[in-house]
């Protein structure tokens, strides 16, 4: 079991869950002198609530056994009662009594083939777990326990064990446990109920396999987006956004979005020029192609063609997803090279510093990916959208700068011949990692709080004859979709002249 006292959950293996389950079964069996098979049925019937099982057995044992199907029932002795069993629309006929398997609480008999078909169709392969398994006869409520399953094939017994395990995980009323949703992962997360209301830690769960998921909805970690919005985004039928209101709006300052990392760069002129982003991509400000691709295009056509297709939410999502996968690959490559095969020149402290930095980049990339969803849902005010993209652009640029610094220092440390060459690294990177972590924490809090910095109370009232611009507080009529003062060319010119005058005076 992997447990950290600072975290409100534990990571358990499949074997540890099985041990806890069998211990619970044995306790009920020993205290109330019933078989392990009956104890298993009772716990499944009452959703693994040992306290409730104990109370019911102490109050009225016979009634509980009758309600759960663990009491013998009288069977109609008609000749057709065991010769033909109808299950919904299926009809199965038995030729004889050879190799028929019965249950201890009724006289219905079925062969192993029918048992397999019945269990797989109604219990093993259904999405919703059932509390208990009952007799295949529609009119019989006798419970099917492990003592009956033991008479079936080994394959059927293994399927039944997995079914009980699923019942313990998905139908448990007492323990807060969920299986890690990552593919091919058998780890189980047990959440400690005393810390359930702690929002600071209860949202994201980190499994030993490396997968990070939301405890509430079991989707991948989607901070700072809520569970409902994350589900709406992922369950969208086409994931294509055609409305122009969801695309990136041009601002009054000439800005260009990097096609690789989505950073916003300012352009000093309307003429095409080559810009160098913090991600080290050099591209044309007009066609948004890399310098090499731009030169090839210019040679073929004689000039570059302006890219008219805007960067939509889906485009931003895909770009951020690729960057996230690249960050994960960098982390896995470092762990494979330096942790599993440590070098004599690297201290354990140095390895952990680099690993923490790479892990932080993965987490920040995941946050930036889910921030793209905000642009999809946040359509209320244009200035709010501009401020949102401004925050996203700063976060992207800050993370890219940190990533470049970490990569440079990592290369220096890995190539260092003496420990003294790592002195600067040991002081710089931990501080930078802490700063980036704090920066993204504040960034997520800003988004989760609803971007209150760009909203004004006058917007929410809606009763006066004017609405006030949240940038310059100018009173606009409700017929105006944009602020007359902010988007007036003459007003912009006056502002520029005023700035020039102030600069000369100073």
Curated annotation (Swiss-Prot):
GO terms for molecular function: ubiquitin-protein transferase activity; zinc ion binding. Zn(2+) 5 binds at residues 284, 287, 294, 304. A zinc finger (RanBP2-type) spans 462-492. It is an enzyme of class 2 (transferase). Zn(2+) 4 binds at residues 258, 261, 277, 279. Residues 79-308 are annotated as: TRIAD supradomain. Keywords: Developmental protein, Fertilization, Metal-binding, Repeat, Transferase, Ubl conjugation pathway, Zinc, Zinc-finger. A zinc finger (IBR-type) spans 158-227. Zn(2+) 1 binds at residues 106, 108, 135, 140. The keyword Metal-binding applies. GO terms for biological process: protein ubiquitination; regulation of double fertilization forming a zygote and endosperm. Zn(2+) 2 binds at residues 180, 185, 207, 209. Binds 4 Zn(2+) ions per subunit. It comes from the Eukaryota. Zn(2+) 3 binds at residues 214, 217, 222, 227. Belongs to the RBR family. Ariadne subfamily. Transcripts of KPL and ARI14, encoded by adjacent genes organized in a reverse orientation, have the potential to generate natural cis-antisense siRNAs (cis-nat-siRNAs) pair targeting ARI14 in sperm, thus leading to opposite expression levels during male gametophyte development. Might act as an E3 ubiquitin-protein ligase, or as part of E3 complex, which accepts ubiquitin from specific E2 ubiquitin-conjugating enzymes and then transfers it to substrates. Negatively regulates male gametophyte formation and double fertilization. This is Probable E3 ubiquitin-protein ligase ARI14. The lineage of its organism: Eukaryota, Viridiplantae, Streptophyta, Embryophyta, Tracheophyta. The gene is ARI14.
């Amino acid at each position: 079991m992997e447990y950290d006292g600072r975290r409100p959950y534990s990571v358990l293996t499949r074997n540890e869950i099985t041990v806890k389950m069998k211990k619970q079964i044995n306790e009920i069996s020993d205290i109330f002198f019933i078989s392990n098979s009956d104890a298993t049925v009772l716990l499944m019937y009452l959703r693994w609530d040992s306290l409730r099982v104990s109370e019911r057995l102490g109050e009225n044992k016979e009634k509980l056994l009758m309600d759960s199907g663990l009491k013998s029932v009288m069977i109609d002795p008609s000749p057709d009662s065991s010769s033909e069993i109808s299950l919904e629309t299926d009809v199965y006929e038995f030729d004889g009594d050879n190799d028929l398997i019965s249950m201890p609480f009724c006289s219905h008999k079925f062969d192993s083939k029918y048992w397999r078909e019945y269990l797989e169709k109604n219990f093993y392969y259904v999405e919703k777990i059932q509390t208990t398994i009952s007799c295949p006869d529609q009119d019989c409520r006798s419970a099917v326990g492990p003592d009956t399953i033991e008479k079936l094939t080994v394959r059927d017994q293994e399927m039944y064990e997995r079914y009980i395990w699923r019942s313990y995980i998905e139908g448990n009323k007492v323990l807060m446990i969920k299986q890690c949703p990552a593919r091919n992962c058998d780890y189980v997360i047990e959440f400690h109920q005393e810390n359930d209301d702690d929002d600071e830690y209860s949202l994201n769960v980190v499994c030993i396999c490396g997968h990070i998921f939301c405890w509430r909805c079991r989707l991948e970690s989607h901070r700072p987006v809520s569970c409902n919005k994350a589900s709406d985004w992922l369950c969208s039928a086409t994931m294509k956004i055609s409305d122009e209101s969801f695309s990136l709006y041009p601002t009054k300052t000439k800005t260009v979005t990097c096609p690789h990392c989505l950073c916003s760069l300012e352009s000093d002129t309307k003429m095409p020029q080559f810009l160098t982003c913090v991600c080290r991509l050099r591209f044309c400000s007009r066609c948004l192609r890399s310098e090499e691709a731009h030169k090839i295009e210019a040679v073929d056509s004689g000039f570059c063609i302006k890219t008219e297709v805007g960067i939509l939410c889906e485009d931003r999502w895909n770009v951020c997803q690729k960057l996230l996968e690249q960050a994960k690959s960098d982390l896995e490559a470092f762990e494979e090279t330096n942790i599993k095969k440590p070098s004599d020149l690297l201290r354990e402290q140095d390895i952990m510093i680099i690993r923490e930095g790479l892990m932080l980049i993965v987490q920040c990339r995941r946050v930036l990916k889910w921030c793209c969803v905000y642009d999809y849902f946040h359509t209320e005010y244009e200035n709010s959208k501009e401020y949102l993209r401004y925050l996203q652009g700063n976060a992207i640029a800050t993370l890219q700068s940190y990533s470049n610094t970490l990569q440079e220092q990592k290369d220096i440390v890995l190539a260092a011949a003496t420990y003294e060459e790592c002195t600067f690294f040991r002081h710089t990177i931990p501080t930078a990692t802490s700063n980036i972590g704090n920066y993204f924490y504040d960034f997520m809090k800003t988004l989760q709080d609803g971007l209150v910095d760009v909203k004004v109370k006058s917007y929410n009232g809606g009763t006066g004859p004017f609405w006030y611009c949240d940038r310059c507080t100018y009173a606009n009529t409700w017929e105006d979709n944009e602020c007359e003062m902010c988007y007036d060319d003459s007003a912009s010119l006056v502002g520029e002249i005023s700035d020039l005058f102030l600069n000369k005076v100073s």
